[in-house]
Amino acid sequence: MDVSGQETDWRSAAFRQKLVSQIEDAMRKAGVAHSKSSKDMESHVFLKAKTRDEYLSLVARLIIHFRDIHNKKSQASVSDPMNALQSLTGGPTPGAAGIGMPPRGPGQSLGGMGGLGAMGQPLPLSGQPPPGTSGMAPHGMAVVSTATPQTQLQLQQVALQQQQQQQQQQQFQQQQAALQQQQQQQQQQQQQQQFQAQQNAMQQQFQAVVQQQQLQQQQQQQHLIKLHHQSQQQQIQQQQLQRMAQLQLQQQQQQQQQQALQAQPPMQQPSMQQPQPPPSQALPQQLSQLHHPQHHQPPPQAQQSPIAQNQPPQIPPQSQSQPLVSQAQALPGPMLYAAQQQLKFVRAPMVVQQPQVQPQVQQVQPQVQPQAAVQAAQSAQMVAPGVQMIAEALAQGGMHVRARFPPTSTMSAGPSSSISLGGQPTTQVSQSSLTMLSSPSPGQQVQTPQSMPPPPQPSPQPGSQPNSNVSSGPAPSPSSFLPSPSPQPSQSPVTARTPQNFSVPSPGPLNTPVNPSSVMSPAGSSQAEEQQYLDKLKQLSKYIEPLRRMINKIDKNEDRKKDLSKMKSLLDILTDPSKRCPLKTLQKCEIALEKLKNDMAVPTPPPPPVLPTKQQDLCQPLLDAVLANIRSPVFNHSLYRTFVPAMMAIHGPPIVSPVVCSRKRRFEEDERQSIPNVLQGEVARLDPKFLVNLDPSHCSNNGTVHLICKLDDKDLPSVPPLELSVPADYPAQSPMWIDRQWQYDANPFLQSVHRCMTSRLLQLPDKHSVTALLNTWAQSIHQACLSAA
């Protein structure tokens, strides 16, 4: 076969039409719609190909592309076949992604290549024919007959390269998938470990909380058990006291009638100093004598005598009236001696001064049964033994009784007991103040408890011992209940309902342990704090008006809402009397106002007036006026207007340098000189960095204009101005630079500017403009800067 005939045969229309029909058949089987027809694709391939082999290889690849689409319809992302052809013309790239061929196994036949084999046989791969069908098109015989062995080898090599590259891509993708799976497994393991650690920590915290709750429950149960035991002990002791009181009543009822007649003479002796109270009030008066010293001595918590350490300090209200009334009678014989001995034993530890003791006070009900009151009125002479008996019973039972006293004149000024840091009243009792317990004299101070309003109820303090009662009010001063050495009758405020009480001197000397005037009472301290508060408020009143002005000023400013709220709260504290705040808060407000003082422009108070002395300065009134007006905005103007005329009258006009007068010109010369319009227009169009003015020192009648040019450029240094002489027939003649070399001899930089300017002027053409001359000047300065750098 003639090779030249084959080379020219592929360009014929019949040959090309066969390939067009084959491409059309492949497109129809693939079922893919394209914007370009098979004829367009073939013509594109025909234009790209240079030889027959290249033309056949491109058509074969196009057919293979469509048949792969037919075999792999599941793949939707198929690239444009025309783009694939364009990428194939330059040779297969690594990866062969531009061809758009899906991967095939090594045993699968090339469907589109079957039409190019000799006699319709499929192309053998690896030397062995594959078991698949040939896949030849029915009208592809003409193409087969024209194929050469070289084309077959090229197509086989291309297919093998594509398969190898696709296999490598598959392996790489598999490796990446395996790596991603390993990373996901590691992340899952880490998350599981973190979750387990969090669960363990939460379990430990929950166990700790449960243990704490169990411990608290156990402590509460133990506390309740203790309370129950103590209440049982109190009930037992109260029953014993009631039995003793009943025995004493039975013994005393037999002796009441005989002793009533004998008790009248000793009771009439002190009646000259003190009126005898009615019989119905005898027993409460006896009780009040007992309760005087015990009211001064608050019971300590841990320093009580060994007899009363483990005894409960409370008595229920329902069991108070009967034992106290019944114990007001006397004990006969040996019981009286025993009571006195025990009373001395109880009194000994009570002498010690005990600071900071919480008073555990129990109220005593003054209600007396009618029968017991009548019996007590008939046995008035048994006051002292009855007092000793009650003291003995109180010491054995650990009870601390506080009677209801009417307010005396010493209490009207407020309680004067000294207050410790913890708010607990502290009282000091000397041994002499306790002699009223043992002295049987009936002339002691007597006060009736009937008309006194009840004291505040004791409230148990949480967190302390369960049986300790703390009075809600401060303990009364000891001096208000002790008889004074100089007796003065003190009238009770409730004299309408109670008989008058007179203070009678005690037989034994008494030393008052506490001076009420030396201890600052709560009422006095609060009065001092009130005075300090009012003084501080008066001191801060100067900030009210500036603060209001500041609030009105920034009221509409959205950025300072926080400052506005602070200022309004400060103004409320200063102006609203209902909003009372502690003194410390007021001091903090003062600090805040001091910080805002500059913003508010608080008027400074005038300086304190200077006391007139004999050597007072003559100009002191003037200095005072200056100090008063020194903050005025027109202060300098006022000083100038006031003092300059006087200073000029004294010293004369100020000395100034003489003004350099320029050469005067006549008006006729000014009228003759005019600037040409050409020059005016050029100057108006100059760069703004050039400032051009007329030279006032030159004036010529021949039409020449002298200009002074200054350079105002932020990127260039300051240099002497440029002087130009523009002729009258400008622009027919060029302007001239008036060289003043002495201005450039100041430093090396200016000398460099002068040299550059001279050299550049020589390069200008014969006819040049003012603009060209000024640009040359600026370039010379720039060149000098570069050379200096």
Curated annotation (Swiss-Prot):
Chain intervals with Gly residues compositional bias: 108-118
Domain of life of the source: Eukaryota
Q: Where is this motif: Nuclear localization signal?
A: 548-565
Phosphothreonine sites (modified residues): 604
UniProt feature, compositional bias: Polar residues: 407-426, 494-504, 512-530
Tell me the function of this protein.
Answer: Component of the Mediator complex, a coactivator involved in the regulated transcription of nearly all RNA polymerase II-dependent genes. Mediator functions as a bridge to convey information from gene-specific regulatory proteins to the basal RNA polymerase II transcription machinery. Mediator is recruited to promoters by direct interactions with regulatory proteins and serves as a scaffold for the assembly of a functional preinitiation complex with RNA polymerase II and the general transcription factors. Required for cholesterol-dependent gene regulation.
Q: Which protein is depicted?
A: Mediator of RNA polymerase II transcription subunit 15
